[in-house]
Amino acid sequence: MAVNEKDVGRKSRVSVVLWVFIALGTLFLCKNAFTFSSESIHGLKISSDDSDSVDIERQISLGLTPRKPVVITDLRTGNKRKLHGRFLHITDMHPDEYYVAGTSIDNVCHSGEPTKGKDRAAKFGNAMSGCDSPMLLMDMTLDWIDKNLKDQIDFVVWTGDNIRHDNDRTYPRTEDEIFRMNAEVAEKIKKIFRTPNSPDPRDFAVPVVPSIGNNDVFPHNLFSLGPTLQTREYYRLWGDFIPEEQQRMFDRDASFFTEVIPGKLAVLSFNTLYLFKANPLVDNCDSRKQPGYQLLLWLGYVLDEIRERGMKVWISGHVPPIAKNYDSSCYDKFSLWMHEYRDVIIGGLYGHMNMDHFVPVDVQAIRENMEEQQMSLLSEDERLTKTIREHAIAAREAHLMGAKPVNKESYLDGVLDTYYKGVLQEIEQAVDSDLDIEKKKKKKGKKKKGKKEKRTLEEIYDQHSIVQVSGSVIPTFNPSIRVWEYNISDITDSSSIFGENQLEYQSWDLFFEDLEHKMKNEFDDNESSFWAASAEQNKKKKKKNGKPDKSIPRKKPDELPAGPGHIQQLFSPTKFVQYFADLDSINSEYEKLIDKGLAEHDAINKAFNYEVEYTSKDEPYPMESLLVKDYLHLAADLARDNGLWKIFKERAFISTGYEDERN
């Protein structure tokens, strides 16, 4: 039988087309399976909110910028959520179940009859008294947030210290009490921000990102690399806040991150206790055995992935990353990570110090310090002795840092002298003409020893980051919380469908599975334990085999533009509103209402209130926006104008009029 060549050709073409369709279909199915294998990777449709339910007058009364929210729809589940371009930062609540109103402040408000007029523990607490927060103060603060802010914010940054200080020998703190109180606080917060009637305990209408404080551990300040009882217990307490795929990594280092806007914006909870000088288990961040070294590697892997996905991130933690608080090697390295990933990191949010202020960090000074350390003629023993002395001082300061403010004015004046005046000098000496820049290029490499090279304004902006330290709920001063506003006006210009760029990336499940293997390969089981590190091993800071120190980041690629903390764009911070509870007025009003015969419950609800203390737009130093350059110019203004500095200090101490005690 003769073969028809045309039929053969036709069948061949049909076969090819069929195989192409099969291949494309398979690719489509695989791609979709890959895309939706994790809840954190999916598309989000963006639309405007056409409802008339926006209460402009209420927003204005809260000091907020009046705006309509944006609606995002999860294309996988169909769930809708509103974005307001705002988030809440709350820290250091320090609730004290032993607080008794009417007792003696000298007895930390736990017992005893007052011996003088000002020695009496007030109903809502006394600013600057040294007592922790009454349970009532915490409850009323959370109740005020529930009634006034919950429906105005997109997420919550919660930076720890959810237990009283260990300042009463009659009632010594126990590990069980610490866990129990943290569980109680966590449940209160879950109740406020969870999606109503949802069967999923992880379904939050407003995502919450907690961090561990130095008083949330037992003994306070001391926290070792996991897995430990404490890391496991905090995962049990916070499991609903932490993405499931990060459980094993959290069990190791008590750090994690949450996509508060999936595929676009994250908040990273960084366990600052592994870099904290006052933690007896922290020697440095140079030894591979050290918790801080290992945590910085984790940070690097996560930031790389966030950068790869085109996302942006806020860093949050309890202890602020300033030289006073961190081991010098930890401070230097952490600051470098903040700088080299400035294309994705928006900023850092911290608590612990109970004062409302900011600290500029100059990466050029950091690099110079690291070079000087390498060139130092100090012997290894001398360096170790110096480190031990610094850590002992830090531990003593941390022990003294209870609720009562001590030498806070002196500290803040030190920030002015060390940081703000340094910024002023840099800005005043900045080279700004093309001729100056050309001369600078020609002189490059001829820098005289001890002489600081001048920079352009743009270089100064680029080489700084800002550490944001928030006021606290505990009445060290007046209780305070802060709402940040950020740019979502460009959100519809970005893409009508968020997450389109996420289609090509692996699920977070696979990423963290891979990361766990990488960390295990880097630090095998025998080496990962902090306790396995001998003193001799800890002293070896330099690698004899010449391998690069992975806890130091690579330089940011030049082609990557600066991120939302440096240039105004989507997610850039634009304004903040500082709220405070004026305890003198509140306690006085409560007493008056009780004297008039009002029931206690009614008097409490009528007397208590948070009000706007100030906003970043307020005189006498209104800020156009909250970029790094805006903070640097504010620092310079504060350094040159004593009148502005006095107002800044009054705000830093939350309108209490605090001054250091004079001898």
From Swiss-Prot:
GO MF terms held by the record: endopolyphosphatase activity; exopolyphosphatase activity; phosphoric diester hydrolase activity
UniProt keyword annotation of Membrane present: yes
TM segment ranges: 15-35
Enzyme superclass (EC): hydrolase
Stretches with biased composition (Basic and acidic residues): 546-559
Listed cofactors: a divalent metal cation
Residues with glycosylation annotation: N487, N526
Catalytic activity reported: [phosphate](n+1) + n H2O = (n+1) phosphate + n H(+)
Entry-linked SUPFAM superfamilies: Metallo-dependent phosphatases (SSF56300)
Membrane topology: Single-pass type II membrane protein
EC code: 3.6.1.10
Annotated InterPro entries: ASMase/PPN1_MPP, Calcineurin-like_PHP_ApaH, EndopolyPtase_N1, Metallo-depent_PP-like
GO cellular component: cytosol; fungal-type vacuole membrane; nucleus
Highest taxon of source: Eukaryota
Protein's GO biological process: polyphosphate catabolic process
Annotated localization: Vacuole membrane
Principal location: membrane
Protein family per UniProt: Belongs to the endopolyphosphatase PPN1 family.
Function: Catalyzes the hydrolysis of inorganic polyphosphate (polyP) chains of many hundreds of phosphate residues into shorter lengths.
Designated name of the protein: Endopolyphosphatase
Source organism: Candida glabrata (strain ATCC 2001 / BCRC 20586 / JCM 3761 / NBRC 0622 / NRRL Y-65 / CBS 138) (Yeast)
